[in-house]
């Protein structure tokens, strides 16, 4: 279990001896630099030093803008090359899934906490038995001892629908160069895939069991798979499904 090794006015430090993934990635250190910067730092032996860095900026009551970076320092060239081949917008889709893991839960939870009296009531309101809860408890201690409250006196807005909480287009895609460009290209590719599919169907019909029939079937299969994949990518750039990855069966 992670433990808090230092708490002060400027934040706190934590250390997790086992580390994530049951120790496969090595020990992890954590730093919360008050009031809004936090990072995890670990070195996976034989692979890389991995950091998860998040800067949270409150923009209105109950809503923050997150600036996240995931720096790697690889110990060999091969992993760096392989990760570099993955388009940035695909990485962003994966990042959305991580952020949305708690999205609905936290949206409800902050309203429960507000009704109970806010951060001073966190210890009485929440049961926090998990490894990650030590960070949450330490953050509330810092807030109650040293932190101010942005938008003091304002009430939380009405609870949003799950569909709105899962939005990715308004919150990210339209403002991200990589994701917005990918979305335009995906939408432009769909008519071409349909054209190939219809052309393949014509080949199957005209081939009369000859070689062109086989070509038509192959082209139809490829076009169908392409349409299926671009639909998945488009959805991934537009909205999440609300299914937390940690709750899915292995």
PLM regions with names:
Residues 1-250:
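C-terminal catalytic domain of Rieske-type non-heme iron oxygenases
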């Amino acid at each position: 279990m992670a433990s808090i090794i230092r708490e002060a006015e400027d934040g706190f430090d934590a250390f997790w001896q086992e580390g994530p993934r049951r120790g496969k990635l090595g020990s992890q250190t954590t730093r919360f630099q008050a009031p809004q910067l936090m990072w995890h730092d670990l070195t996976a032996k034989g692979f890389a030093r991995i950091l998860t860095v998040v800067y949270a900026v409150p923009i209105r009551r109950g809503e923050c803008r997150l600036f996240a970076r995931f720096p790697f320092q690889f110990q060999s060239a091969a992993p760096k090359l392989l990760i570099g081949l993955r388009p940035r917008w695909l990485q962003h889709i994966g990042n959305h899934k991580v952020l949305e893991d708690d999205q609905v839960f936290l949206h409800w939870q902050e309203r429960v906490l507000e009704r109970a009296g806010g951060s001073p009531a966190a210890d009485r309101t929440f049961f926090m038995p998990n490894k990650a809860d030590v960070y949450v408890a330490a953050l509330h201690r810092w807030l109650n001892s040293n932190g101010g409250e942005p938008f003091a006196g304002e009430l939380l807005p009405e609870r949003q629908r799950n569909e709105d909480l899962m939005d990715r287009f308004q919150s990210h895609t339209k403002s991200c160069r990589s994701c917005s460009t990918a979305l335009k290209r995906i939408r432009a590719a769909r008519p071409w895939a349909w054209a190939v599919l219809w052309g393949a169907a014509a080949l199957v019909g005209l081939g009369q069991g000859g070689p062109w029939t086989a070509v038509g079937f192959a082209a139809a299969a490829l076009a169908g798979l392409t349409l299926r994949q671009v639909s998945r990518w488009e959805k991934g750039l537009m909205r999440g499904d609300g299914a937390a990855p940690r709750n899915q069966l292995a």
